[in-house]
UniProtKB/Swiss-Prot annotation:
This is Probable Fe(2+)-trafficking protein. GO terms for cellular component: cytosol. It comes from Photobacterium profundum (strain SS9). SUPFAM superfamilies: YggX-like. The lineage of its organism: Bacteria, Pseudomonadati, Pseudomonadota, Gammaproteobacteria, Vibrionales. NCBIfam families: PRK05408.1 (NF003817).
Length: 90
C-alpha cells in the first residue's frame, strides 16, 4: 500500500516515496514531505545540473552545491537555473 504525503513542492497530497532515498536528517525531511512526482522532477533537474555544469560527485564542493540546489528546489519553491540553457519550444 502506498503512502500519501502532503508534498511541500507540489502543495498537494500525493503518493510518497517508498523509502528514504537520501541520508541523514535531510533525507528524513524529504521522505516525510516530498512526493514521488516531485522527486522525479528533481532527478531530472539534478541530471541537467550535473551535465551542464560538469559537476564531479567525488568533489565535496560540487556535492554541496547540488544539495543546496535540491533544498531550494524541493522546499523553497525555486526552480533550477542553468546559464545558457534554453528549454525546447513546443
Amino acid at each position: 500500500m502506498s503512502r500519501t504525503v502532503f508534498c511541500t513542492r507540489l502543495k498537494k497530497d500525493a503518493e510518497g516515496l517508498d523509502f528514504q532515498l537520501y541520508p541523514g536528517d535531510l533525507g528524513k525531511r524529504i521522505f516525510d514531505n516530498i512526493s514521488k512526482e516531485a522527486w522525479a522532477e528533481w532527478q531530472s533537474k539534478q541530471t541537467m545540473l550535473i551535465n551542464e555544469k560538469k559537476l564531479n560527485m567525488m568533489n565535496v564542493d560540487h556535492r554541496k552545491l547540488l544539495e543546496t540546489e535540491m533544498v531550494n528546489f524541493l522546499f523553497e519553491g525555486q526552480d533550477v537555473i542553468i546559464e545558457g540553457y534554453t528549454p525546447p519550444s513546443k
